Amino acid sequence: MGKWVSVAEKRQFLKWFLTQQLKRKDAKRILEYLLQHYHLLEQVMFTEEIRGRERTLVISTLQSDEPGFAFYLYRRKIEDPIRALGELQANPADPIYLILHFHGKAQNHQYLQMLDSESREYIKRFKQFQAYKEETDSLIEAVLIENEKKMLLQQIDEALDLKDERRFKDLVKKLQELDRRSS
């Protein structure tokens, strides 16, 4: 079960969300309909995962990489907002799980406060994995550069042993470029 969030908080956030440019303009009608009907807004729970056995509404802004609209109705995916709106009108007492995709949502405290606890934990883990990924990428990059430097230094030694001045100068130039890139 989701975290309790007041209808006023949901309304305030959804009004802000509607100021964003949505990928599917007809999805805006659904959110406006929810805002106009208190009893439906009571049923809305913000989440980050599609609930296979529940009604889940997914809406994205233009700044998101996610699809613009999808409505999951008991394991069926519906991409027509008009049909989704009809389903919401026909079954007003059923819970509505809402997934919103927009730029900066991982840092939007108002949004994060409304997410159910499982979703908050999911975002927390995602942020941690992003930090691990960045750390790992920079470590791998440093190791690759260090290996390339060692290889160039060995080749420079070989060029000196063979008294190959042209190759020596080329390799020194490559080493200097590598040093500039890694600084």
From Swiss-Prot:
NCBIfam families: PRK03057.1. HAMAP family: UPF0302. This is UPF0302 protein BH3876. Belongs to the UPF0302 family. Gene3D superfamilies: Uncharacterised family UPF0302, N-terminal domain, Virus Scaffolding Protein, Chain A.
